[in-house]
Amino acid sequence: MSSTILTNVTTYPIKSTQGISLNNALVKETGLELDRHFVITDLNGKFITGRTKSALVLVNSNITATGLILNAPGMPELRITYNNFSNKYQNVQVWNDEISAQHCSNEIDQWFSMYLNFSCRFYYLGEHSHREVKGLDHKLSFADGYPLLLISEASLEALNAKLEHPVAMAQFRPNLVVSQCLEFAEDGWHKIRIGEVVFEIVKPCSRCIFTTVNEITGKRNKQKEPLSTLKKFRQAKDKEIYFGQNLIALNEGSIKVGDKVEIISKHPPQEYSVSN
């Protein structure tokens, strides 16, 4: 088999909304530049995701020199400008972490509240915000637990071969997609180099109900697919279901689509039970 290559790079500026495909990207300690640097919360500061508000996956972002431009079904276009953000910081909750986050503006709060039909607020990972990966001296954005997620095309193909209705890679929300490797080869990788960056694969990614949300319709699959099928061959002893690998970047640098993926070192892959 020819060398493994990077085939897709995706950043998700707003947690749980649509990703933006990039031809090249700067990788920082927190992951891809701008990835999960915005989060939507309830009025108490608890984060909101597509797990409970699946319509978020239909919110489209475009990056500009001064901020973002947002579009969503039935909503007027919204321009987000960094210079208009408030100077107020408030603690927001992402899982068990409390992060001091910069409140953006009442106008943006109202836009998301109207779209979701739910009172909410919108925050940015400002210069005074700080969060670390658990157990590692490594900065983190509003991502679930790790800065980056990698999945191979072969792994998705192996899953889709078991599904009645194939799913798109977008339902798993990876930052990095690679091709020209065996299915689940990434399970055994420990350190890899892509472009200028060395990555350490620190943990398989446990999957939840969010993977059942169709990225085009914003609706959940009633049969809980593909999670139900994944459970049959990707459930570990801890009863979690895993698909994809969490990464941290060991240095900052640039990567681009077409870069070779160099496997620097390997480790024993997680074991999974298989059920009928």
Outline where the language-model segments fall.
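Metal-cofactor-dependent catalytic cores
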Residues: 1-276
